[in-house]
Design a protein with these regions (language model features):
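Structural signature of cysteine-dependent C-C bond-forming condensing enzymes
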Residues: 2-21, 29-86, 97-100
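Short beta-strand scaffold segments in enzyme catalytic cores
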Residues: 91-95
Length: 100
């Protein structure tokens, strides 16, 4: 996933994972992450911080991990992407943002 993000998005796009804060909720994971995205857009632009051990994998591209208190850039049309990859190849990328 990090390789795809590094190829598709510009350098410096904020990245995070909510699973360390919620646990492995299986079928509810996508709904929870969508709720985090919606909250970021509607309550002060605060992004969910990336909680991790700080040990980057040198085989993967460096990404800009969201830090506590970091906010979404104020742009004319804000949007967030939530990726959900599940058992059996059930995958989805949900884009949530301001109406045009």
């Amino acid at each position: 996933e990090s390789q795809a993000v590094a190829r598709v998005f510009p350098d410096g796009v904020p990245c995070s994972s909510t699973k360390p804060m919620t646990g492995h909720t299986l079928g509810a994971a996508g709904a929870l992450e969508a709720a985090f995205c919606w909250l970021s857009l509607t309550h002060g632009n605060t992004l969910a911080p990336h909680v991790w051990d700080g040990q980057a994998d040198p085989a993967l591209p460096a990404l800009r991990w969201v830090t506590p208190g970091q906010t979404l850039a104020l742009t004319p049309q804000r949007c967030l992407m939530s990726n959900s990859f599940a058992f059996g190849g059930n995958n989805v990328s949900l884009i949530i943002g301001d109406a045009p």
